């Protein structure tokens, strides 16, 4: 019997009147808010404004969440598609199942298109959000803790995770493989949600540190490439500790393949940007010019609106 362990929460949702509030959703929401705060702080240093980030967030985040959900459903089709699954389950996001790789892919594409539409330099937007993403992901992982999901193999380590939900053990790959399920009351499991939280927070700190230390040497976009490399590397080993059911291709879990691809893409992007990437200072000057133009138009529109209101009062 292990005397030291990490307990699981005794609840994953609560009621406020007729509404059911899921902790999984709260964790994701808090993560998004913290990420927006970090992103805004860094974006302003480049010469941007909060309104620019707010508009970008309102466009990008919903698309990223849809991408995260669809990626999860596509890579674990048994629960969502016939003959074994139900399409209605795709809509049950409160039960968990948001794959960050899908969110990153769709979110990056939408952010790129939006920045292009608004004439914002995407490379420094990517750098600004680089440490914000892993922080948001770290906070979001707490949702897996509340749902008692995505844990790892059995362990005797003093930081092992203790489950208190009989249904939680059925979510593991051990049961899917036909082996006897371990007794959740006496077995501890690797808290992979915690491993990823720590890994992500270290990554965010490293990106901020290196971005400051190497400010004169880095090209615009290289900090985002660091994020891709760090997260891809981390998910490669963390994914091999997890035992939730996952589609296996050529002996490796789907997310391991995706993590490897993300890591390689990050390496390639880092090298290419080092050779051909834009100068961050030039990009910042471009953003400052766009911001000044937006503020001028906004001032003109506000003045026109004020004059219209004044004209109505004098009639």
Swiss-Prot record:
Transmembrane helix recorded as keyword: yes
PROSITE patterns referenced in this protein's UniProt entry, alphabetically: LGT (PS01311)
GO MF annotation terms: phosphatidylglycerol-prolipoprotein diacylglyceryl transferase activity
Location in or out of the cell: Cell membrane
Protein's UniProt keywords contain Cytoplasm: no
Entry GO terms, CC: plasma membrane
Membrane topology according to the record: Multi-pass membrane protein
EC numbers on record: 2.5.1.145
GO biological process: lipoprotein biosynthetic process
InterPro entries xrefs: Lgt (IPR001640)
Keyword entries, A-Z: Cell membrane, Membrane, Transferase, Transmembrane, Transmembrane helix
The protein's annotated pathway: Protein modification; lipoprotein biosynthesis (diacylglyceryl transfer)
Enzyme class: transferase
Function field: Catalyzes the transfer of the diacylglyceryl group from phosphatidylglycerol to the sulfhydryl group of the N-terminal cysteine of a prolipoprotein, the first step in the formation of mature lipoproteins.
HAMAP family cross-referenced by the UniProt entry: Lgt (MF_01147)
Family: Belongs to the Lgt family.
Official protein name in the record: Phosphatidylglycerol--prolipoprotein diacylglyceryl transferase
Species, as recorded: Bifidobacterium longum (strain DJO10A)
Source species taxonomy: Bacteria, Bacillati, Actinomycetota, Actinomycetes, Bifidobacteriales
């Amino acid at each position: 019997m292990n005397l030291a362990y990490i307990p699981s929460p005794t609840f994953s949702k609560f009621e406020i009147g007729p509404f059911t509030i899921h902790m999984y959703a709260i964790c994701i929401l808090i993560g998004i808010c913290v990420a927006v705060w970090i992103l805004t702080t860094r974006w302003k240093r480049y010469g941007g404004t909060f309104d620019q980030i707010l508009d970008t967030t309102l466009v990008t985040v919903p698309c990223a969440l849809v991408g995260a959900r669809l990626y999860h459903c596509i890579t674990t089709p048994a629960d969502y598609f016939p003959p074994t699954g139900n399409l209605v389950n795709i809509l049950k996001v409160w039960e968990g199942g948001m794959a960050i790789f899908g969110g990153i892919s769709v979110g990056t594409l939408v952010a790129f298109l939006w920045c292009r539409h608004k004439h914002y330099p995407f490379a420094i937007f990517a750098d600004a959000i680089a440490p914000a993403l892993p922080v948001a992901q770290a906070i979001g992982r707490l949702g897996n803790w509340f749902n008692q999901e995505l844990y790892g193999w059995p362990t005797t380590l003093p930081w092992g995770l203790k489950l208190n939900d009989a249904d939680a053990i059925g979510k593991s790959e051990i049961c899917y493989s036909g082996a006897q399920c371990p007794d959740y009351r006496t077995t501890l499991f690797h808290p992979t949600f915690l491993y990823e939280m720590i890994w992500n927070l270290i990554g965010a700190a490293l990106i901020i540190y290196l971005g400051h230390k190497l400010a004169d040497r880095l090209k615009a976009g290289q900090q985002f490439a660091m994020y891709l490399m760090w997260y891809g590397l981390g998910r490669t080993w963390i994914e091999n500790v997890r035992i939730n059911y996952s589609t296996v291709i050529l002996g490796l879990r789907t997310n391991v393949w995706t993590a490897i691809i993300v890591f390689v893409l990050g390496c390639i992007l880092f090298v290419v940007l080092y050779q051909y990437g834009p100068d961050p200072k030039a990009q910042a000057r471009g953003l400052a010019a766009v911001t000044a133009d937006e503020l001028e138009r906004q001032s003109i529109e506000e003045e026109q609106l004020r004059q219209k209101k004044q004209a109505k009062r004098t009639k």
